[in-house]
Amino acid sequence: ALTSMTSQMREGTIRKCDMASIYTYQNTLYKLQMNGWQLRQFMEWSAAFFKTWEPGDVTIAFDSSVRYYLYDAFAGVKYDLDISKQPGNRIQNLTWMDGRPVEDDDSFVVAVNNYRATTQLLTYADIFKEGDELPKLLEIDVRGDVGGIRELLGEYIRTVKGGTIEPHVDNNWKLVGDNWNTADHEKAVKLLREGKLALSENADSRTLPGKAITTADIAAF
């Protein structure tokens, strides 16, 4: 989950304050076991962060009731997130990294922070309801001898990456269903960059724009 909308990891020396900037909370790491059905429910809950694409939209928009730190992207599997579909039906083509379809009874070990584990995955809340089988807790405070997630990030950079990291994108997932005209989308992006259009702002700074730019918005330009 993204914990800050303003943090950046700039080229150069990485300092402890950089870890605190990109990960603002004192979370620890939990290790859970879940089956394919549970994983899909988790992913569908996260995918509700996006508003459903509607004809005429030329940018994506976000559910303004969902704070950005409640959105999780997933590694270790491949999937499409279809924003033309309603929440609960958006995760498409979910496979293992080798292309095998994920089945409901497949077993996964999933790393999440303690907040997500205790508020959503190990209790009945938004994702799982009474009667559902909950994921199994395998370990709390993983590598607690090192510290929390901030410290684990630093440890990973030092010991696994040899002290140097470079930008890398897995490309294991993508947004689909944004069926806009490419020229209209590019025009909207140009107008936004020129300051001739602006994205909507929400009262809660922890949420993202809840209104898409539309063909009607760009028609006057």
Task: Mark where each language-model region is.
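Catalytic centers of hydrolytic enzymes
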Residues: A1-G195
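Extracytoplasmic Gram-positive cell-surface binding/anchoring modules and repeats
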Residues: E186, K190-F221
